[in-house]
């Protein structure tokens, strides 16, 4: 990837009618279908940027320890900046399988990046040389389907837990409001100290 000169905004950067340009901050370890920054055709001609196809697996190579190793799966044609490594799966690899497999490496890449220098990073070579186990395509698809189902299940449980937390907060707030406004008499609920005989 590459970064068009930001001093030439009009020549290289545009609105949503341009070419999506992926930066490390766009990577959320999920399918990427939208970005915040778009570049022009002129940017493609004048820089190392090139448009990558949907199904490209992307990995953040630098940007600090919270960013190194973050990844995404392109769901749209897009260009990437120089801090992102794009991996184009071959015909023997299902893109989503490779995407999920690459996620496994993030903790290892982060450890290596932290020991590399003051500003943590990993090299494109290190990403490209990551050993990827390739089961038959049928098994790759089965693994991806299993992960999708488990992810959907996890998302549903997470949403249910969030609703429960919100309901408990509402009830707590209502209870406090009722106690403060006198709608609930709490005088008999707290034991009173015995009067000391004089």
Describe each model-derived feature in a short phrase.
Residues 23-24, 40-105, 123-124:
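A short beta-sheet element
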Residues 27, 39, 127, 180:
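Hydrophobic pocket-lining residues within nucleotide cofactor-binding pockets
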Residues 129-198:
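Amphipathic alpha-helical coiled-coil/heptad-repeat segments
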Residues 31-36:
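Cytochrome P450 core scaffold surrounding the K-helix E-X-X-R motif
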